[in-house]
Amino acid sequence: MARQHPIQDYRNFGIMAHIDAGKTTTTERILYYTGKNHKIGETHEGAATMDWMAQEQERGITITSAATTAFWNGKRLNIIDTPGHVDFTIEVERSLRVLDGAVCVLDSNQGVEPQTETVWRQGDKYHVPRIVFCNKMDKTGADFFKCLSDIVDRLGAKPVAIQLPIGAENNFKGMIDLVRMKALVWNNESAGAMYDVEEIPADLADKAKEYREKLVEAAVELDDDAMAAYLDGKEPEEATLKTLIRKAVISGAFYPVLCGTAFKNKGVQPLLDAVVDYLPSPLDVPAIKGVDANGNEVLRHADDKEPMSLLAFKIMDDPFVGTITFCRIYSGILQSGTGVINSTREKRERIGRMLLMHANNREDIKEAYAGDIVALAGLKEARTGDTLCDPENPVILEKMEFPDPVIEIAIEPKSKADQEKLGVALAKLAAEDPSFRVTTDHESGQTILKGMGELHLDIKVDILRRTYKVDANIGAPQVAFREKITKPAEVDYTHKKQTGGTGQFARVKFQVEPAEPGAGFQFESKIVGGAVPKEYIPGVEKGLNSVLTSGVVAGFPVVDVKVTLIDGAFHDVDSSALAFEIASRAAFRDALQKGKSVLLEPIMKVEVVTPEDYTGSVIGDLNSRRGQIQGQDMRGNANVINAMVPLMNMFGYVNNLRSMSQGRATFTMQFDHYAEAPANVSAEVQKKFA
């Protein structure tokens, strides 16, 4: 079957926004007007087509990006719905990674909100061309012009209005199209399906003229011929102006701004027209870079004739189909039944069912082409960020980078049956979401869940309970302390048990000293003349190792210590490996006491990105958490603060930072080193654990 839609008619785009800006409602309306949805799903009734997980329908926020295919004016739209909550930014990152363009939705009442800044920065990182839709123009306090100034002040970007609102709040009737210089006015009877194209109202004529001039001036800057014609007094024709706006969007020179109210069905069709007219096709964006089998950089162009390559950007567990892997095909043609290689993991796979997804419905297809976004059922090895490609032409496409988790909790299943279900469920959840990690604490034997924030882990626990029917207790977050000696110590210890029958005898003399940070445990025997026979040395080491797991301060593992066996004695009959193990254990514990053992705590490297206004509060708060500020610098129009902070003082920080900065600051943290805990902290921990 040949390709039905030329690749230049594809628009792979996402809708990005702050939580509650009306992103899912906008997507719903797009699906409605492109004829994919017969009944509009309202988010606040918990029934939106894109928000199909039970957790999303209850909370009314979008958690999983669902991919949907629709058509408008003969163009094929692949829409990815992205979440707007800070704990789900990983979802936004991986969506932006495979998109060619995006619509940024703003709440006209709120303007640019905190999460808008975060997703905008991610869009900048991946150079995603964007248009802006000022939604909720019918809301009290809606202000289109404040949105324009916010984009300049808070995003450091250049907005250019291509529409102006007619009326606002309850009187919002439609918009002036500055490209065509016509008024688009909706009649309320047709659920927004019909609107009239009229002359611009007289009271708005001057404003329309002023903003039309701004638009034309910004557009002609991109083309010398158009600029020369404009300076000669020639206005660009509509087709020329659209070409120039498209050029601006693709190059990032400026961002066209539209307005409307998705909920009241006004302005969605012109938004779709703008997606088709101004957002790039796969041919308009740079070819994706990759690395071939020899480590050389290669390019894969959006072309059916090139070797097949695709990137897995999302894994989902579907109750009917099993594991579904969402992929963007960057080059070549993919057919069901073909063998592919997962070049990231060097594993071979066979393509079984291939599906086009529409929110929660699916359509089986046999063939997909460069530029398509498809769902593959039944892949065993693929993980998010993996490359699948033609075995004859292996390539690894640009990898996605995922942040390390910043919060962890312990989970304990309530019964044996839950224990078995938990293992399977956690493996699936970790495969679906690279920012969610599962580890086992070797010291406590507990299963530890790590994630991007408290809401992130709440939702994972909720999925465990609902989808996988696992009942479990959730613990409070914990810190992994360590212990270390601070000065050298020498001990001479004799273990003697000789009361008739086979006795026990062993004498050991150790020199114990602190080792370099990160050196771990080092053991050396300097025995000469057979004072301790060779066959007993393993017993000595076993005794020492048994103490390492539980030190003398508060029972935490001992690190960075060197033990030298310098002398000893044995008995021909009563000595054994066990006797030397017991002697070594007691001697080592004595040495740890004599060597003034201290408690070590993990220190985290913390980076906070905050608007200038909150810098003082953020630094003050980090200082109150025993943080040491390492430096500050500017990134765009945000301030970046680097600090070293003890992990035990970082619990709950994500929520504190959010409220301190009205959600506008973000942070990342990773383990850096262990450092001696202050006496008061050590005393508190000893009281709790020892």
From Swiss-Prot:
It is found in: Cytoplasm. GO terms for cellular component: cytoplasm. CDD domains: EF-G (cd01886), EFG_III (cd16262), EFG_mtEFG1_IV (cd01434), EFG_mtEFG_C (cd03713), EFG_mtEFG_II (cd04088). SUPFAM superfamilies: EF-G C-terminal domain-like, P-loop containing nucleoside triphosphate hydrolases, Ribosomal protein S5 domain 2-like, Translation proteins. GTP binds at residues 17-24, 81-85, 135-138. Keywords: Cytoplasm, Elongation factor, GTP-binding, Nucleotide-binding, Protein biosynthesis. Pfam families: EFG_C (PF00679), EFG_III (PF14492), EFG_IV (PF03764), GTP_EFTU (PF00009), GTP_EFTU_D2 (PF03144). Residues 8-283 form the tr-type G domain. GO terms for biological process: ribosome disassembly. Catalyzes the GTP-dependent ribosomal translocation step during translation elongation. During this step, the ribosome changes from the pre-translocational (PRE) to the post-translocational (POST) state as the newly formed A-site-bound peptidyl-tRNA and P-site-bound deacylated tRNA move to the P and E sites, respectively. Catalyzes the coordinated movement of the two tRNA molecules, the mRNA and conformational changes in the ribosome. Belongs to the TRAFAC class translation factor GTPase superfamily. Classic translation factor GTPase family. EF-G/EF-2 subfamily. This is Elongation factor G. The gene is fusA.
